[in-house]
């Protein structure tokens, strides 16, 4: 039987891995330069955590979660998103004792049972961060500013930040009533999911992928904001304008998770076609209380690594790739192998990437393998070289080679490589 990867998953290797490392390392640098700490949460959680946070009527809970019973009969779900686990960890570990304005970032796999397509897999990966404590629109501004900084640091330019405010529980009551009236007139035209959600969670109709055209003419949340939410949204836009962070007001935007309040945003890249979203986020001031804690304001963002990499490729952005096979040490004989291992250790201490042959191949086979793996240089050590107290350094691109005194080989090779 030939085993194959599960549908909706990917193996990542070769040049592709450098795109992943570039995105992840850039994200870490941006977060840590802004005082955001890393947090790591389990890949699976109690199912109820996501039902309560994401929303029982959301597509994620209704159709997309990987849920199973463990041997103790508990309902367990592979995490479909990263915010709820961070909130759970914050509450369970009493991190509130550290004070307000805490910041945590995460990088890792998420799982949703969707139809696999370009950049949207069943196991996908996200970078994200959460800022816990501040209620001020200054925090909303900082989140969007940091997302913009991260994407620009990657080299991306062909994206737009879509922005909206969906209000708070106070002003959302009137908005729900307006939506009820609007959708009530066209209820017979809606899909079965929307007909059900009309009774249970009217806001989810705005996020329907089947009946999306109806949302274009639906009442807009910004027209129903209370004074506090309207002032919050206005101030956020003032900050963005002052710092020249470009955005597009999009009053059809609600995001697909029930926990959002007030600010929501989504980043869309023009090179990705209809599935253009590469990141998104917003404020979730009621989530801590919903999950059993005290009322704590919070907000955050998540970006899809696969989607961001597609955007990098769409813009033709060159990323740094390190040659992990830079120097290859080819040896002939046991004594030569032992000396090759010692030389490899000396070169690695100087920060070079070095392979040593361990296949007992002929010299021609070793050099062919070195070229195939992309090595720039080969160091050749045999009985004759040992007798003379030298090694041979060959440039595999030009074919030029030079004899080097063994005692100075590590210094010479390191200096030669540094000049390339």
Swiss-Prot record:
This protein's record includes keyword NADP: no
Residue ranges the record marks as coiled coil: none
Any single GO BP term: histidyl-tRNA aminoacylation
InterPro entries: aa-tRNA-synth_II, aa-tRNA-synth_II/BPL/LPL, Anticodon-bd, Anticodon-bd_dom_sf, His-tRNA-ligase, HisRS-like_core, HisRS/HisZ, HisRS_anticodon
This protein's record includes keyword Endoplasmic reticulum: no
Highest taxon of source: Bacteria
EC annotation from Swiss-Prot or TrEMBL: 6.1.1.21
This protein's UniProt keywords: Aminoacyl-tRNA synthetase, ATP-binding, Cytoplasm, Ligase, Nucleotide-binding, Protein biosynthesis
A GO cellular-component term linked to this record: cytoplasm
GO MF entries: ATP binding; histidine-tRNA ligase activity
Family recorded in the similarity comment: Belongs to the class-II aminoacyl-tRNA synthetase family.
Entry protein name: Histidine--tRNA ligase
Native species: Thermotoga maritima (strain ATCC 43589 / DSM 3109 / JCM 10099 / NBRC 100826 / MSB8)
């Amino acid at each position: 039987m030939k085993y194959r990867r599960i549908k909706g998953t990917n193996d990542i290797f070769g040049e592709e891995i450098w795109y992943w490392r570039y995105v992840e390392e850039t994200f870490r640098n941006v977060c840590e330069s802004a005082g955001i700490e890393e947090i790591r949460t389990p890949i699976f959680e109690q199912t109820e955590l996501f039902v309560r946070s994401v929303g029982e009527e959301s597509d994620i809970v209704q159709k997309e979660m990987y849920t199973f019973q463990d041997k103790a009969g508990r309902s367990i779900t592979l995490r479909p998103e990263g915010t709820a686990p961070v909130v759970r960890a914050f509450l369970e570990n009493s991190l509130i004792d550290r004070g307000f304005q805490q910041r945590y970032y995460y990088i890792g796999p998420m799982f949703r049972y969707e139809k696999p397509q370009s950049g949207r897999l069943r196991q996908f990966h996200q970078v994200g961060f959460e800022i816990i404590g501040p209620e001020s629109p200054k925090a909303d501004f900082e989140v969007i500013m940091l997302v913009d900084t991260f994407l620009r640091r990657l080299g991306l330019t062909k994206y737009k930040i879509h922005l909206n405010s969906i209000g708070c529980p106070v002003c959302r009551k009137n908005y729900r009533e307006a939506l009820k009236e609007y959708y009530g007139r066209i209820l017979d035209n809606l899909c079965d999911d929307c007909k059900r959600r009309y009774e249970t969670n009217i806001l989810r109709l705005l996020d329907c992928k089947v009946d999306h055209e109806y949302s274009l003419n639906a009442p807009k949340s910004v027209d129903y904001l209370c004074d506090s939410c309207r002032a919050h949204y206005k101030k956020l836009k003032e900050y963005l304008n002052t710092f020249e962070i470009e955005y597009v007001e999009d009053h059809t935007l609600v995001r697909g998770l029930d926990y959002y309040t007030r600010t929501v945003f989504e980043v869309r890249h023009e090179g990705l076609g209809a599935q253009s979203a590469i990141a998104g986020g917003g404020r979730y001031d009621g989530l801590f209380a919903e999950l059993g804690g005290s009322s704590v304001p919070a907000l955050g963002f998540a970006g899809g690594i696969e989607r961001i990499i597609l955007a990098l490729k769409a813009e033709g952005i060159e990323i740094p790739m390190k040659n992990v096979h830079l120097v290859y040490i080819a040896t002939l004989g046991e004594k030569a192998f032992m000396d090759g291992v010692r030389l490899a250790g000396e070169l690695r201490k100087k920060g070079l990437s070095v392979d040593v042959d361990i296949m007992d191949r002929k010299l021609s086979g070793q050099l062919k393998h070195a070229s195939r793996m992309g090595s720039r240089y080969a160091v050749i050590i045999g009985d004759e070289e040992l007798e003379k107290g030298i090694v041979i350094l060959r440039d595999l691109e030009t074919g030029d080679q030079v004899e080097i005194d063994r005692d100075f080989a590590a210094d010479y090779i390191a200096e030669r490589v540094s000049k390339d």
